[in-house]
Every structure is written in C-alpha cells, then in structure tokens.
Amino acid sequence: MKSLLAILALSLLWSAPALAQEKQHGGGAGHHDVGGGYVPKHGPPPVRNAPHPAPAPAEHPKYNDKEGHPEAPHVHTNGKWVGHDTGRDDARFHLAHPWEHGHFTGGFGRGHVWRLEGGDPHRFWFHGFYWMVADPDLGFCADWNWSGDDIVIYEDPDHVGWYLAYNTRLGTYCHVEYLGNG
C-alpha cells in the first residue's frame, strides 16, 4: 500500500510541471493555427504589389480572417502574416528619426525567443533591451502578459525604424520601436 501511494505521489509531482506548462501556453487565440507557442521561421515579406491603404482614423480593419482568429494582426502556423499589407507609405508608421536609439542587435527570428520582464505597451523590456509599442497598435496587445509572455522580434521590411514583436502564446504581433539597452 505504501508503494502504491509513493508511486501515485511521484506521478503527481512529475505531471504538475506539464500541467502548468499546458495552462501557461494553452490560453492562445482559441484556434489551432494561430499562437499556441508557434514561432514563424521569418518575418513578413515586403509588400510588393499595390499596398492596401492605411485605414482611415474612424475605420477599424478586420483581421480575424477565420472563425476564432484574433481581431489583431497575427501569424498563421503556416507562416502567413495577416495584417502586414499597407506598405512603405503608411503614414501611421513614419518616424521623423528612425533608429534614434540605435539598432537592436540581440537577435531576430525563431532562434531568439525573449521572455517579457515587465512594463506595459508604452515601455517594456527583456534582457536589458527596452521597447515601446507603436500608437496605432496599442489596442492589439491589450491581452499580452508584460511580465511573462514569450516574444520574438523581427525586422519590419516596410516601415523604416520599426520592428515587429510577435507574441508566441497568442500568435499576434505589434509594431515596436527599440529604445536602447541599459
């Protein structure tokens, strides 16, 4: 009987971390092909065709391209970036002084997953690197966990001075500006 209880106790101890991990990453976008820990191999391609115009201030573009997808720019698990289609001339992402705080050199893409360590959309950080979310994208990161979500940084091929921060749990991304380190 004692052996059976010991085995049961050990089984519970071994399964607890797996259950906690499942809970941490299981709160994604609610659809199996967005988020859930997926990390795209690369960022979005540059817009090559006639770009979609930036939405008018009163307009709200639709991003949930499938049932259950987030109403925010996101990436499918097949690598398709949804919502990055306005091109270089999108005035919402024009910076008077691109790279004002330098270039981010911490690493990009799949091999560089960063855990958010604190802050909010106006100033957040990880590993001594500081960032802020672009004003037009503030509504797209309201459900990010600023002290625990994993993100991946990609270079933005269309908007000079901006990067894209991709949230692996939710599968959503935002334009972010690098504010420097230290």
PLM feature segments, named:
Residues M1-F93:
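Extracytoplasmic low-complexity, disordered linker/stalk tracts in cell-surface/secreted proteins
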Residues H60-G182:
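Low-complexity segments
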